C-alpha cells in the first residue's frame, strides 16, 4: 500500500529528533527549505509538521518557526495530591517560589462560584510563580477560606502552605476533584512566566476537600506546555 508522502517526511524528521540530529530548543529548517529537501509541495510539508506538532515533537511559534520540544518532560501525578515543595523534592532540579500577590480579598464572582462562597466570606488569594532550572514555568493561583485557614503569611506561601495547614493547623487534607484543559495564554501568564513564545498553557483546576468533606481550596495551576506531562496509573475493574 502506498504511504502518503507527508507520513514519510513525518517519520524521517521524528527519527532525526529522537536520534539527536535536532535537539530541544533548536529550530527546524523552514517550510521552503524542507519543500526543496524532500522534493515535494509546501502543503505536504505543512501536513508533516502538523503531525509532528500533534505528537509532541515540535511547537510552531509565529515569527520563529518550528521549535523542537524537550520530550524529557517533568512528570506530574494526576491522581496524587501533593504540594509543589513535595514535588520539587522528587524532581531533582533547582526550584524557587516567588509570591506575586498575597492577602485577604472578598471573593470575585468566579471564586464565589468555584468555592461555593458567599460575598461576605473572607478568602485568601495567593498568586505564585514556580521557577524550575532557571525558568518560571508554573503559575499557581490559590484561594482558601479564611474560616479554615485563619492565619497565613508570605513566608508560609514561599515555603509550603500544605505543610503549614497539616503541620501547624492540624487539618487533614483528604481529596480533590481535578480538571485538566489547554487554554490560550493570558496577559498575566506573559507577565509572570518565561513563555518562550508559546501561546497555550496546560491548566489544572483543583477543588480540594478536607477530611470532613468541606471544600476549602480552589487552585488554578497554569503550566508551560512543553515542560510537563501528566501521568496516572489505571487498573481495569473486574
Curated annotation (Swiss-Prot):
Disruption phenotype: Cells lacking this gene are constitutive in the expression of the trePA operon. Disulfide bonds: none annotated. The keyword Transcription regulation applies. Keywords: DNA-binding, Repressor, Transcription, Transcription regulation. Induction: Probably induced by trehalose-6-phosphate. InterPro entries: Bact_HTH_transcr_reg (IPR050679), Chorismate_lyase_/UTRA_dom_sf (IPR028978), TreR (IPR012770), Tscrpt_reg_HTH_GntR (IPR000524), UTRA (IPR011663), WH-like_DNA-bd_sf (IPR036388), WH_DNA-bd_sf (IPR036390). GO terms for molecular function: DNA binding; DNA-binding transcription factor activity. One of its GO terms (biological process) is negative regulation of DNA-templated transcription. Residues 1-71 form the HTH gntR-type domain. Residues 31-50 bind DNA. CDD domains: WHTH_GntR (cd07377). It holds the Pfam family GntR. Repressor for the trePA operon. It is able to bind trehalose-6-phosphate. Dimer of dimers. NCBIfam families: trehalos_R_Bsub. This is HTH-type transcriptional regulator TreR.
Amino acid at each position: 500500500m502506498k504511504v502518503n508522502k507527508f507520513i514519510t517526511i513525518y517519520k524521517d524528521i521524528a527519527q532525526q529528533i529522537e536520534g539527536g540530529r535536532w535537539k530541544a530548543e533548536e529550530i527546524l529548517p523552514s517550510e521552503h527549505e524542507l519543500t526543496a529537501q524532500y522534493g515535494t509541495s509546501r502543503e505536504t510539508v505543512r501536513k508533516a509538521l502538523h503531525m509532528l506538532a500533534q505528537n509532541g515533537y515540535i511547537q510552531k511559534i509565529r515569527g520563529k518557526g518550528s521549535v523542537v520540544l524537550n520530550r524529557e518532560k517533568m512528570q506530574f501525578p494526576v491522581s496524587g495530591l501533593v504540594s509543589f515543595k513535595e514535588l520539587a523534592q522528587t524532581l531533582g532540579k533547582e526550584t524557587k517560589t516567588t509570591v506575586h500577590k498575597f492577602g485577604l480579598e472578598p471573593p470575585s464572582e468566579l471564586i464565589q462560584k468555584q468555592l461555593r462562597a458567599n460575598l461576605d466570606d473572607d478568602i485568601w488569594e495567593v498568586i505564585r510563580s514556580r521557577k524550575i532550572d532557571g525558568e518560571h514555568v508554573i503559575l499557581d493561583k490559590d484561594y482558601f477560606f479564611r474560616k479554615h485557614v485563619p492565619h497565613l503569611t508570605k513566608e508560609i506561601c514561599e515555603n509550603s502552605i500544605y505543610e503549614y495547614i497539616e503541620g501547624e493547623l492540624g487539618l487533614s487534607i483528604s481529596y480533590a476533584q481535578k480538571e485538566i484543559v489547554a487554554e490560550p495564554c493570558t496577559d498575566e501568564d506573559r507577565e509572570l512566566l518565561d513563555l518562550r513564545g508559546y501561546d497555550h498553557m496546560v491548566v489544572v483546576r483543583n477543588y480540594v476537600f478536607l477530611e470532613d468533606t468541606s471544600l476549602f481550596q480552589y487552585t488554578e495551576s497554569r503550566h508551560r506546555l512543553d515542560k510537563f506531562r501528566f501521568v496516572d496509573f489505571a487498573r481495569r475493574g473486574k
